[in-house]
């Protein structure tokens, strides 16, 4: 019979996704067949599986940590906000519909038996499932129809460990408040608490641990030290802490336009881990500066984000930068914005029927009802073999003054040839639909060399850090960190359904 443990949090960005990934790697290293599961994920960071199914990126990196291929069953429901009131609802990798919050709140009850069936299919194939909640279980205005926190725990009778982020402050209030806002049955499901991102001497924390255990009658089974692990961040909350000031000591300054509806910002994790590369996220012209490369990322609402560029003054800043021989790369929605105009006759993305683009590429995009979700391999215009994935609802046509960026050779593992993207005559403006393009070592190394030689400097002096190898190392570090700082004997008892009591054992931080 499958063992299960559910990680819920006192708030968004408490560390749930990373904790689940670490536990998956820890159990994998013990020889267990383990998979992650999150019934419903709201995120604009998504991935396309080998079968063309769309799922949340968090469950992808958790699957990697577990040593298994991403499977859409690990995240059956994906919500992709299109604006502040509406989301695209994706079930088992395919679009169901666009729904406002009230409509979806009523609709999601119909998904419960389907979610249960999906979960059971994973349970039949594995030894352990590590479930992840969303936000906080104490969203009392939504709990009557919850399918991702206590509602999910109840569906499969999973024990819950609550994780709280001490780095933001107010950790004991968040633990107590979360638990006390739950009803009696839900409180009983919380079997342990983990305090995350702790800095300092745990002896100073111990009086608080003793008091919170007495107040809640729930044991604190771990205190995880703050660790500077270089893992993908999925929650858009993390963008608020991203750097916007260039590092004067770096060899290259890369500026990413932080669009209000930015999607798949995980595309840029690979840039952030390379030595001597400054990556910053800019929201206004005051922070624009004089970068060596500007990247316009993907967007869940390209037309509205194009309007943001216009209103913020960033449109003019990018155009002037390009006129002065600046290098600009657009990914997916960013590629669409680089063109002359975008047309939305069926109002797929917004109520605007047409909007002018940046005019840096001789292209036009029309938005279609059908979404393209594929994994691809191909060869770029300069001969680099690349792989990545596409997620878009637009079709872009090139004019005579552009050439294709990439020749696609295979789609979802099947031989299929077509052209992707566009390049300007002077080669400084590039647009592509390929997410993950920077994850290709040779392409990235050549890009860095080009940017540096353009500054009359020598080629990039470091070996490109391979993303897959890097992530494997980070997953192992994470697993070791958790094993050293969680009372694993207590956690395993919880997973077996055994009752554990508030302990007199004092946790000790181990780096």
UniProtKB/Swiss-Prot annotation:
GO biological process: cobalamin biosynthetic process
UniProt xrefs under SUPFAM superfamilies: Class I glutamine amidotransferase-like, P-loop containing nucleoside triphosphate hydrolases
Gene3D superfamilies, A to Z: 3.40.50.880, P-loop containing nucleotide triphosphate hydrolases
Taxonomic placement: Bacteria, Bacillati, Bacillota, Bacilli, Bacillales
Protein name: Cobyric acid synthase
Assigned keywords, A-Z: Cobalamin biosynthesis, Glutamine amidotransferase
InterPro entries noted in UniProt: Class_I_gatase-like, CobQ/CobB/MinD/ParA_Nub-bd_dom, CobQ_GATase1, CobQ_N, CobQ_synth, GATase_3, P-loop_NTPase
Pathway participation: Cofactor biosynthesis; adenosylcobalamin biosynthesis
Presence of the UniProt keyword Phosphoprotein in the record: no
PANTHER family reported in the protein's UniProt record: COBYRIC ACID SYNTHASE, DETHIOBIOTIN SYNTHETASE
């Amino acid at each position: 019979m499958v063992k299960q443990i559910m990680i819920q949090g006192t708030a968004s960005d408490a560390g749930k996704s990373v904790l689940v990934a670490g536990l998956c790697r820890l159990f994998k290293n013990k020889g267990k067949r383990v998979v992650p599961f999150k019934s419903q994920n709201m995120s604009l960071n998504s991935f396309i599986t080998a079968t063309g199914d769309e799922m949340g990126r968090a469950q992808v990196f958790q699957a990697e940590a577990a040593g298994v291929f991403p499977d859409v069953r690990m995240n059956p429901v994906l919500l992709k906000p299109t604006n502040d009131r509406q989301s695209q609802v994706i079930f088992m990798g395919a679009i169901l519909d666009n729904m406002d919050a009230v409509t979806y709140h009523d609709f999601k009850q119909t998904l419960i038996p389907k979610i249960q069936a999906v979960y059971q299919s994973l349970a039949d194939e594995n030894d352990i499932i590590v479930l992840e909640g969303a936000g906080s279980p104490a969203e009392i205005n939504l709990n009557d129809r919850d399918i991702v926190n206590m509602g999910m725990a109840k569906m499969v009778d999973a024990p819950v460990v609550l994780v709280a982020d001490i780095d933001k402050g107010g950790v004991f209030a968040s633990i107590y408040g979360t638990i006390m806002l739950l009803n009696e049955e839900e409180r009983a499901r919380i079997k342990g608490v983990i305090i995350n991102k702790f800095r300092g001497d745990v002896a100073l924390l111990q009086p608080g641990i003793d008091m919170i255990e007495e107040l809640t009658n729930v044991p604190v089974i771990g205190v995880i030290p703050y660790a500077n692990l270089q893992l993908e961040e999925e929650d858009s909350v993390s963008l608020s802490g991203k750097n916007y000031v260039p590092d004067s000591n770096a060899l290259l300054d890369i500026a990413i336009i932080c669009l209000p509806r930015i999607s798949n910002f995980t595309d840029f994790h690979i840039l952030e881990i390379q030595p001597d590369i400054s990556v910053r996220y800019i929201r206004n012209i005051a922070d624009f500066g004089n970068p060596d490369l500007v990247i316009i990322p993907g967007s869940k609402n390209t037309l509205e984000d194009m309007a943001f560029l216009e209103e913020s003054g960033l449109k003019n800043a990018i155009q002037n930068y390009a006129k002065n021989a600046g290098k600009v790369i657009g990914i997916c929605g960013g590629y669409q914005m680089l063109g002359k105009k975008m047309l939305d006759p069926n109002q797929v993305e917004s109520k605007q029927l047409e909007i002018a683009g940046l005019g840096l590429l001789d292209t036009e995009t029309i938005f279609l009802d059908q979404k393209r979700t594929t994994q691809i391999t191909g060869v770029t215009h300069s001969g680099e073999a690349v792989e990545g994935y596409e997620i878009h609802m637009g079709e872009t046509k090139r004019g005579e003054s552009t050439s294709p960026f990439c020749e696609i050779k295979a789609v979802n593992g099947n031989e299929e040839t077509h052209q992707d993207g566009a390049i300007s005559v002077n080669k400084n403006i590039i647009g592509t639909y390929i997410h993950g393009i920077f994850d290709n070592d040779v392409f990235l190394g050549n890009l860095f060399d080009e940017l540096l030689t353009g500054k009359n400097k020598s080629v990039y002096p470091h070996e490109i850090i391979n993303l897959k190898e890097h992530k494997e190392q980070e997953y192992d570090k994470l697993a070791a960190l958790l094993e050293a700082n969680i009372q694993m004997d207590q956690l395993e008892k919880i997973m077996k359904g055994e009752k554990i009591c508030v302990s007199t054992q004092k946790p000790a931080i181990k780096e």
